[in-house]
Amino acid sequence: RGFGVRGALGVSDRANAAASQLKPGDVDWDDVFGRRGARWFHTGGIFAALSETTAEGVFEAVKAAKRYGTIVSYDLNYRASLWRDIGGQEKARAVNREIAPYIDVMIGNEEDFTACLGFEVKGNDAKLKKLDLDGYRAMMDEVAAAYPNFKVIATTLREVCSATVNN
């Protein structure tokens, strides 16, 4: 017999992963998007935060993709634990704001849009028990106005009822 339900525990242990070792110039993006003709490129905030060099690699990739007319999607996916060692939220915001003008499809929840781009949903309670849909619409309108290059902006809405129930 135990005591209660253990909360979820996530570990972003990507230290020394092959992707974290990538540096600008390691991938021939002109070959990927030009010669090979990749039509869609997806990346995101987790990859950008893996090391000091991966954010530069993402920037290099999205610029090359746009040169060839490749659709670029990006999941903000802010993870404080990954950004902590390379400059924290301030660095995350600077990096994501630099990348955003090259993105066609931007994905993220309200916390991602706040942490990574500085947009906030007004009207939600701190525990997200009751969502203000007008606040979400207003934030998305602000995002679309700031980044007219976004062809699609996607988010999720979740009301937290309890530790085990979400709507």
Label the predicted regions.
Residues 59-66, 144:
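Surface-exposed amphipathic alpha-helices with a cationic face
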Residues 39-46, 118-124:
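Acidic/polar active-site rim loop that often engages polyanionic ligands
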Residues 66-72:
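Short, conserved structural micro-motifs that define repeat-unit consensus positions
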Residues 68, 79-167:
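Conserved phosphate/ATP/ADP-binding segment of small-molecule kinases
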Residues 75:
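Acidic/charged, solvent-exposed loop-and-adjacent secondary-structure segments enriched in E/D, K/R, S/T
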Residues 1-45, 69:
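Conserved N-terminal subdomain of the carbohydrate kinase-like
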